[in-house]
């Protein structure tokens, strides 16, 4: 650095001789050595309006700053200047004969280069240009040439100080001593025997500090500049304060159960954070001290921000210990987890894999190959995600759940893990087996982590790890053999032990956040479903491998190993094989998780569905929680957009008992209603039995869940009465998780409780008086039970079931002009004259086609004020009422009167179609044939009871017959055929001639049950033909 002192005039006013910079610096140093302290640093400027940050516990504040000046150069003081403003400061005198002491301690953490005045070095010459200076101009008093200050060390080998062209070591040391005297570099206190002082925190320093607030130290900058620089200079927390981070604590005063839960979580927090990391604290301290001796090789050079050293002391926002993690699950999992950030963090981003390095683009020159390599990278990282989640689940069930139950029992004064019915507690039994499973999967997780940490899709090597551990997966067999017993014991214990059930409920809802409500019982299937996941992951992984490569062959071998293991386990358990589930998973186009915990495949088969015009093929899949009615595409996969997923608890099914529909099953639900036709009556009965059992189990689970919510609500109400000593209105900040969970549980229960479910729910009012409506009647508030006709979608009658309108009094026959219509409320077949329009609740109160009878019912409900829920009504200022209709995301406000359109045939009712069947001896579908015709015609025939007339109809529900025959005097013949039974009615004339022919009517019945009824009716009313030999 040059110090231009030529502008100073000497006291004798003689022009100074031309001297070099070295000579001027030597003269300046002699003055300092003689005790002239006028060039020492000035007192610090007045403090900034912003509060300075508190120093860390291990640091001592050093408020050294360069002296202000008016020029761009440093001038020696004149004799006229007063020395009163120069503070006397004891310091170490440095002479050429004295031994130079250490210039200060080495930094604890290697800092980035410190650039004075915010300027970057652009050259190594003495005069450095400022073309790379930041946008804000530096302070006028600090516009000296750029100086790059390295951390205080015992050697200064950089040639960028002062005269870069001077290479002698003594010159560099002299310049270093000048930096010490000027305050840019810390000095040793008390002659070097005391505690060393740290380098002062500069306004451009990026070292991590404890406080989140900081002081720039520059009072000349504007507030806007300060705010902009604050974003880039935010201090991070120091490692010493890592264990002191305040964890969120839910202070609840609502129930004893909630208070007990809070105490337990606080204890477990202390157990895992304070106690479990005592040894790690020593290691961290040693590692931090060891960093003192580590000086990176690139100190003094410009480093890329992306390649900067990662500060392990800083807790990233994606970590489990972030300040935003306020729930108990995040706290406990972050306490117990000792894995790396790649396992514990779950950051978003397309190119990010759970906190790991971004997935590279693999620029090979071929775009398709680049995409393949990138997908292969994602497939490899997916192994790590799945295995990490599974290991975490095992830890929660084997460690966290028993510990939680034990501590909860101590709070309530009894042992919740005591023996039950003379046997060891089921929680301890589960713990014993899962503790044996956990080490194997931790080893597998470690190996997968090792592979993923050095992953390169051009050299894949995941198959070897999976193939090696495939045989060890059999360690889960003992748990799978006893899983059904564990399930029954848990159910029994929760039903009998109220406190055990409450503790489990709190653990499920507050800590164990897996699946719906995080049910512990439902998650027991995780162990078995883990088998299936490995093969699915390997299949996806192998898809992106190049054919005829070694890794492809190893992947196929690993897949076969996994298949053998899962086949053996599934055969022993009597469950579907992995291959079957894998095929089903891909038929769902990977859009439905067949391996969801608690979800088991029960049955699947091809069926036929009766549509309004014809029979169409469908594929029926039954799980423990859903029934799928799938439309199969030409490729064999399911068309998800045109398939229906029906929850079992919201469904009704009914066997059709008519002879022609003995293979049919009618399914009705709020999602979809249909008539399913199976291949045989036996298959229909098997499906009905499985549906009945699956629905019962599902409702039982919902009932237990709702009962737990009710108990929690009752306890909360009781404790509120005891704790409400002073009337206080809780604000929004007091609404902690239990209240939110309870309200959500109640709403879910209320939505699932209708006429189809026997699950008990919290009592809710069915209506409320709303005087603003003007009707003076009780209106529904939208949360009570609704009639089945308002919730269940109807099964439409097929078009060929009738050739005429089915409304009583209407004689319209369907043809090209008069087309068929279906009522959306009851599924009835009507004509255009009997069709009206009305809003239906099952279609979100949108306007739909209805028959005359349904229109009358809904219009009467509208007049009575009970059709629309009060939450859907909007009262205008002029007392007119508007309603909200449509789906949740597509609401529309309309005038309710515009939603109704009366039919032409107003007031007509449904025809009694059962009357015809009730007045007959036998009724069914037949195939009528005449002697003059060789073809058969489908007809529906009945034998009338009162007059013994055989009547044939064109359609099943027609009222007009096409043929009537009085069967008195007829003989009958019956002949068994391969496709049914043939019945012939023969009438002979009393006068017979050679050309006389018998009058014969024949028809075939394809249903065996219907054929028996026809045979019995003819045998009772007619005589057998005697001519039949």
Swiss-Prot record:
It comes from the Eukaryota. Keywords: Cytoplasm, Cytoskeleton, Guanine-nucleotide releasing factor, Metal-binding, Repeat, Zinc, Zinc-finger. Residues 1-12, 20-39 have a biased composition (Basic and acidic residues). GO terms for cellular component: cytoplasm; cytoskeleton. Residues 212-227 have a biased composition (Acidic residues). Residues 141-155, 200-211, 335-347 have a biased composition (Polar residues). It is found in: Cytoplasm, Cytoskeleton. Residues 1-155, 185-254, 279-370 are annotated as: Disordered. One of its GO terms (biological process) is filopodium assembly. SMART domains: FYVE (SM00064), PH (SM00233), RhoGEF (SM00325). A zinc finger (FYVE-type) spans 810-859. Its main location: cytoplasm. Residues 375-572 form the DH domain. The keyword Zinc-finger applies. Zn(2+) 2 binds at residues 823, 826, 851, 854. Activates cdc-42, a member of the Ras-like family of Rho- and Rac proteins, by exchanging bound GDP for free GTP. May play a role in regulating the actin cytoskeleton and cell shape. Required for normal lifespan. This is FYVE, RhoGEF and PH domain-containing protein tag-77.
